[in-house]
Curated annotation (Swiss-Prot):
The lineage of its organism: Eukaryota, Viridiplantae, Streptophyta, Embryophyta, Tracheophyta. The keyword Nucleus applies. Highly expressed in the panicles. Keywords: ATP-binding, Chromosome, DNA-binding, Meiosis, Nucleotide-binding, Nucleus. The gene is MSH5. It comes from Oryza sativa subsp. japonica. The keyword Magnesium does not apply. SUPFAM superfamilies: DNA repair protein MutS, domain III, P-loop containing nucleoside triphosphate hydrolases. Disruption phenotype: Normal vegetative growth but severe reduction in fertility due to a decrease in chiasma frequency at metaphase I of meiosis. This is DNA mismatch repair protein MSH5. Its main location: nucleus. ATP binds at G572, P573, N574, Y575, S576, G577, K578, S579. GO terms for molecular function: ATP binding; ATP-dependent DNA damage sensor activity; double-stranded DNA binding; mismatched DNA binding. One of its GO terms (biological process) is homologous chromosome segregation.
């Protein structure tokens, strides 16, 4: 990505502000938020259990990243706390309380009636407006209407929206589109799950002052993001934040990836063309802003973007052979048709429109800021011709003026009439100011100002310069004003095609995402998963998408979860790969739901509604201990998990007393076995006592696995072992903690002491005290004293000699 694209992406991120409104009535919560970078209004309604900590609101906040949240002054305190709460490392949004009347149904409804959407025809009646809006959002949801209308009123009052047009009956707020979202359509992952699975990883800028833009670190998103457009990156992030459970949409993405993997020349040509595609709505926003100045480079980029979009259609027409066309038809992909319907002839018209007005090379050729093409406006052409010939004209006028002076000037450089922007025409003298004596002979001279530099300059108004001011005026800014008026008219005409341009850019962004996923699938040897409505999970030789990038050899593992064996308990030593295994399974499921190929030899993935993670979050912003965070996650898991959910528990119970941990772990597993069809559970633990005691019920749902190791002595865990990283049926009763300590670089004397303590415990002997030289000398001294005391005869012995022997001076 070049510097210009990075700057555009940076500007978009800086400009991107998300403003949210939230209204609660009973258990129903209406949410609306406006994304300033996309000019879109999103609305949704959710149902929350008031006895919990509002997990769905946390999920919406995490996905939308609002900077400000507006709510009523009558909002319940529990909801306020949920709105103010921050997620992981994200900064908490500012929560502003507004008058409750702002969110009244009547005012909100009236506000929505005057909402102007980009695709809405002019002159619609109120009834027609209602029908149009109802096609984009559910106007029957009162909390949704109150949130959306209240937010529009707030944005209008605080002047946060860009376009305000006056209509009969009030102001019309213009946005590009309204979109209703439903959490039921997505695979849900909260911030904790994203952190545990390393979906995103933001690396702060290393500047000491914190100046600079953060970048994506080593993460799943960072690895799969090969997008070449800023819109593609933004859309791909949205796909990662909102994995879908619509099997038709997923299969369409997978089919398209499969097709591109069969025609790499087409894929390469498309990616090369997409590199020139920019964020046209963002560019038009800049063109339309009165505070910004558009350069020839901006218009050149705009034209190049339009041409690149049109070229996409040509690539499909030329690059897709008859054989590939049959393949597309067999895969049920209407890629060419979608491209033709998205990138329409209107873009040709827009290109011709701009080319007919803008000459991007004129400024470079003429040496000043000028954009409008010659021959478009006769008056403008005349002004520009005068301005371009002005230096020669002023030189001639200066010579005539100097010749008319009543005396001659003895100076290194002859005086000259110059044109200064916004000031006018002035007679310039170099090096020295005209003396008062000479000024007497020049009654029409009036000193204006002086300028310091390599050579001093003194400027004067004269009769001739005043005539030039009246005759020519500030000609340069006349040219700029005329050009800006022409360009403003051009922008208005181009903006009439914003819906078509946006549709084309959105198609390019989606195409960019698909190509990015195809590139990664080819580079990393991913395979196409099979999605099914059945709640099963079968993975052959699955791999961890990130871990395999960091090691020379990665050992893959299988996963098979059907109607039985849905609760997998995994034991094994530290460092044996338990956590990596359960994470890799979750990542395969996650990637399948964004429509990506997956790191495995084959995969059958049942549609999943939610991924729960209780894996010991390490967030420093949480006020709770790691164990309390795990308890909270497990509690949410037990309340909301369904047969379609995937639950990950890594070392649950280790943060408290062993007995309590075993009890909590056993109770959690028992709870899952009570389901007719439990969720898919992957659980790793070192609490192997649950197998030796009666902590677990007898159930067909439970299967035990272990990570295999090669150990010379099966009875001890202090020998050298070889980790095989292979998942096999069974249970591991040894943790090989001493070997792991050696691998971690723990000092050998500490490890040796641990061996001694463990040996005493296994032999049920008192634990021997450590032997230190000073301590051993004192022990010997005490032993000698005791020996002498036992040998001393209190009746016949010499007490003085005894004390001298025991306590020598």
């Amino acid at each position: 990505m070049d510097e210009e694209e990075e700057e555009e992406m940076s500007e978009r991120e800086v400009d991107s502000q998300v403003h949210m409104a939230c209204v609660m009535q009973g258990r129903r919560v209406g949410i609306a938020y406006y994304d300033s970078s996309m000019h879109q209004l999103f609305v949704l309604e959710i149902w929350e259990d008031i006895t919990e900590d509002f997990p769905l609101i946390d999920l919406v906040k995490y996905q939308s990243k609002p900077s400000t949240i507006y709510t009523s002054t009558k909002t319940d305190e529990a909801l306020l706390l949920a709105l103010q709460r921050n997620d992981c490392n994200d900064e908490a949004p500012a929560v502003k309380l507004m008058k409750s009347s702002t969110f009244s149904y009547e005012q909100a409804w009236h506000r929505l009636m005057y909402l102007k959407v980009a695709a809405m025809d002019e002159g619609l009646s109120v009834k027609e407006r209602i029908c149009f809006l109802n096609s984009m959002m559910d106007l029957g949801s009162d909390v949704q209407v109150r949130a959306a209308g209240g937010l529009l009123a707030i944005l209008d009052n605080e002047r946060l929206l860009d376009t305000l047009d006056q209509m009969e009956g009030g102001a019309s707020i213009a946005i590009d589109s309204v979109a209703q979202i439903s959490l039921d359509k997505f695979l849900k992952l909260d911030a904790t799950a994203h952190e545990a699975l390393q979906i995103f990883q933001v690396d702060k800028h290393p500047s000491y002052m914190g100046i600079g833009r953060a970048k994506e670190g080593f993460s799943v998103f960072g690895m799969l993001n090969k997008c070449v457009t800023p819109m593609g990156k933004h859309l791909l992030r949205t796909w990662f934040l909102r994995p879908i459970i619509d099997i038709d949409v997923i299969n369409n993405r997978l089919n398209t990836i499969s097709f591109f993997l069969c025609c790499e020349d087409v894929m390469s040509a498309l990616r090369g063309t997409l590199k020139s595609v920019r964020d046209i709505p963002h560019m038009l926003k800049k063109f339309n802003s009165p505070s910004s100045f558009c350069t020839s480079s901006d218009w050149h980029a705009f034209l190049k973007c339009i041409c690149s979009l049109l070229h996409i259609n040509k690539i499909f027409e030329v690059g897709i052979s008859e054989h590939l066309a049959i393949k597309l038809q067999h895969m049920n992909i209407d890629l060419v048709g979608k491209a033709n319907s998205s990138i329409t002839e209107e873009l040709d018209y827009v290109s011709d429109l701009v080319v007919g007005v803008i000459d991007v090379q004129r400024g470079k050729e003429k040496g000043y800021d000028t954009l409008v093409k010659d021959g478009l406006c006769e008056e403008l052409d005349e002004l520009r011709m005068v301005y371009e010939e002005l230096p020669d004209f002023l030189e001639q006028v200066s010579a005539n003026e100097i010749a008319s002076f009543p005396f001659s000037f003895e100076c290194r450089k002859a005086p000259l009439i110059v044109y200064v922007h916004q000031i006018g025409y002035l007679m310039c003298f170099f090096d020295e100011k005209i003396s008062d004596a000479l000024l007497i002979g020049l009654p029409d001279f009036e000193f204006a100002f002086s300028e310091e530099g390599e050579e001093r300059r003194f400027y004067y108004h004269t009769q001739k310069t005043r005539e030039l001011d009246n005759l020519l005026g500030d000609i340069y800014h006349k040219i700029l004003d005329m050009e800006r008026a022409i360009i403003r008219d051009l922008v208005c005409r181009v903006c009439q095609f914003i819906p078509q341009l946006t549709k084309a850019v959105n198609f390019a962004a989606e195409l960019d995402c698909i190509l990015s996923l195809a590139i990664v699938a080819r580079q990393n040897n991913y395979v196409r998963p099979i999605l099914t409505e059945d709640s099963i999970l079968e993975i052959q030789n699955g791999r961890h998408a990130l871990q395999e990038m960091t090691v020379d050899t990665f050992v893959p593992n299988d996963t098979k979860i059907r109607s039985s064996g849905r609760i997998n308990i995994i034991t094994g030593p530290n460092y044996s790969g338990k956590s990596i295994y359960i994470k890799q399974v979750a990542l395969v499921v996650f990637l399948a739901h964004i429509g990506s190929f997956v790191p495995a030899d084959s995969a059958i993935v049942g549609l999943t509604d939610r991924i729960f993670c209780a894996m010991g979050s390490k967030s420093m912003t949480s006020e709770q201990s790691t164990f309390m965070i795990d308890l909270h996650q497990v509690g949410t898991m037990l309340r909301h998990a369904t047969s379609r959910s995937l639950c990950l528990l890594d070392e649950f119970g280790k943060g408290t007393l062993t007995e309590d941990g075993i009890g909590l772990l056993g109770g959690t597993i028992s709870h899952f076995t009570d389901y007719d069809c439990p969720p898919k559970v992957l659980l790793s633990t070192h609490l192997t006592q649950i197998f030796t005691e009666s902590y677990l019920p007898q159930s067909e749902h439970i299967k035990c696995y272990t990570m295999s190791v090669l150990n010379p002595d099966e009875q001890t865990d202090n020998e050298d072992v070889i980790f095989l990283y292979r998942l096999v049926p069974g249970q591991a009763l040894l943790s090989f903690g001493l070997h792991c300590a050696q691998l971690a670089g723990v000092p050998s004397e500490v490890v040796q002491r641990a061996v001694t303590v463990l040996g005493d415990i296994h032999s049920k002997r008192p634990i021997r005290r450590m032997v230190w030289e000073k301590l051993a000398a004192k022990d010997q001294q005490y032993q000698d004293a005791v020996t002498k005391l036992l040998a001393f005869d209190p009746h016949k012995g010499d007490l003085v000699n005894f004390f001298q022997e025991v306590f020598p001076s």
